[in-house]
């Protein structure tokens, strides 16, 4: 071996550097593939403007790049430059390998370490038909009463915890048939302590309110999907889609549809699209259809300096999903993600933004959506949706329950003979 090294020292050093560079590349690839497979992670690679997640991909190529640069230098008389680059390649291989394995271990272990507190919540199984109670509203019988909030962001000091608690107390007092939390319940999805803080407050303030949370992009961070399922989707639960992240809920008076859109369409694959179209196509034409998601569709907003894409009128969601909503006559789409409250309308489909459940408000919109009809900025609150036999009544409430804005949507089913598809409302 010594003779081999002495006679072929450069070739041996080159092979050694190559082997370690390939190990580093393999470890880096394994880490990125695992991370990319997690719910919501694809959005980080697409939306992050800091290059952090691009660096996570490219760092695996660094050792090979340094080794490649050393090859032409082997032809010059002085061997020191090529030797130095091979040394840098070896060192970077070790560092990249350690970083990749460390990140991989964190992604696997962090959301699985620690115990979630036992929560006293009235979680709703999406597979079970929702029963509703009746109540008079302006001399009309309310057939279904929903409350909706989003972007509570437990775990960050940027959230107004008093406003969040006030909103929950107002919802508890309203006693809805179902309370939808549309995501970003916590700031960092892999943090057990943040989930426990959320579960503690929810258990204390809305323990008896029927609850159905969706997963937002912050909830999904770094493997947060596992804690989301532990907290809000017990093993005994099931759904018509087979997924805990998107499903429909049948009621006597409405079809409720929850989508998995943490950032945008990164998780809106063929399976979810096919399921969605089938649900909408076969929906009872005598019932209104209400769709819920975390990320928005039409919305006012701004250009966020920390992001690589416009934070308004969603450039992915609009072309991918709004034609489906219009084709099948969806009545109302409710989303969070933007920290405003806003009501919009486009092609006779109504959209509500409700991302104001205590988290720091987004700045005054630099871009006002052409679809916008009303907006409240720097105002905390939630939305109540009351369904009567003729109308969907959408009430935007402030943190103390005062009505800020109200919309009445008359839902008209398709009565075309022989057609199961719904048509847009007149």
Describe the function of each predicted region.
Residues 154, 186-187, 219, 255, ...:
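Short active-site segment of divalent metal-dependent hydrolases/proteases
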Residues 110-138, 192-289, 304-332, 340-388:
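Extended active-site neighborhood of metal-dependent phosphoesterases/phosphodiesterases
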Residues 176-179, 330:
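Proline-aspartate-enriched helix->loop->beta-strand connector
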Residues 178, 219, 297-299, 360:
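Feature marks short, surface-exposed loop/turn motifs that line or immediately flank catalytic pockets
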Residues 155-161, 187-193, 264-268:
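Acidic-and-aromatic substrate-binding clefts and catalytic sites of carbohydrate-active enzymes
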Residues 146-148, 179-181, 213, 291, ...:
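Residue-level marker for buried hydrophobic side chains located in beta-strands
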Residues 151, 183-184, 216-217, 294, ...:
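Active-site glycine-centered loops adjacent to acidic/histidine catalytic or metal-binding residues
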């Amino acid at each position: 071996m010594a003779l081999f090294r002495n006679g072929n020292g450069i070739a041996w050093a080159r092979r050694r550097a190559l082997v370690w560079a390939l190990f580093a590349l393999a470890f880096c690839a394994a880490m990125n593939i695992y991370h990319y497979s997690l719910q919501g992670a694809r959005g980080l690679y697409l939306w992050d403007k800091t290059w952090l997640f691009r660096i996570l991909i490219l760092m695996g190529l660094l050792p090979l790049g340094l080794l490649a640069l050393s090859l032409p230098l082997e032809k010059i008389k002085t061997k020191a430059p090529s030797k130095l680059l091979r040394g840098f390649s070896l060192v970077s291989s070790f560092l990249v390998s350690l970083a990749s394995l460390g990140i991989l271990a964190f992604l696997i272990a962090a959301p699985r370490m620690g115990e979630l507190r036992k929560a006293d919540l009235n979680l709703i199984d999406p597979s079970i038909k929702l029963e509703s109670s009746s109540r008079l509203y302006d001399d009309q019988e309310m057939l279904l009463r929903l409350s909706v909030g989003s972007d509570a962001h437990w775990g960050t000091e940027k959230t107004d915890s008093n406003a969040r608690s006030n909103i929950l107390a107002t919802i508890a007092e309203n006693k809805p048939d179902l309370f939808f939390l549309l995501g970003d319940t916590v700031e960092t999805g892999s943090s057990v302590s943040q989930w426990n803080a959320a579960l503690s407050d929810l258990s204390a303030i809305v323990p008896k309110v029927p609850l159905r949370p969706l997963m937002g992009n912050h909830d999904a961070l770094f493997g947060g999907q596992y804690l989301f399922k532990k907290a809000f989707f017990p093993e005994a639960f099931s759904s018509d889609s087979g997924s805990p992240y998107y499903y429909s809920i049948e009621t006597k008076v409405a079809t409720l549809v929850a989508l998995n859109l943490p950032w945008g369409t990164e998780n809106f694959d063929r399976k979810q699209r096919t399921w969605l179209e089938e649900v909408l196509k076969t929906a009872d034409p005598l019932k209104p259809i209400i769709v819920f998601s975390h990320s928005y569709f039409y919305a006012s907003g701004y250009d966020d300096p920390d992001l690589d894409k416009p934070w308004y009128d969603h450039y992915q969601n609009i072309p991918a999903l709004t034609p489906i909503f219009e084709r099948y006559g969806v009545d109302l789409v409710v989303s969070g993600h933007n920290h405003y409250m806003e009501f919009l309308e486009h092609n006779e489909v109504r959209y509500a933004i409700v991302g104001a459940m205590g988290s720091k408000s987004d700045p005054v919109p630099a871009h006002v959506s052409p679809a916008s009809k009303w907006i409240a900025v720097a105002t905390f609150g939630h939305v109540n949706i009351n369904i009567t036999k003729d109308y969907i009544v959408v009430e935007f409430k402030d943190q103390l329950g005062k009505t800020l804005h109200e919309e009445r949507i008359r839902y008209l089913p398709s009565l075309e003979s022989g057609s199961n598809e719904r048509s847009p409302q007149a």
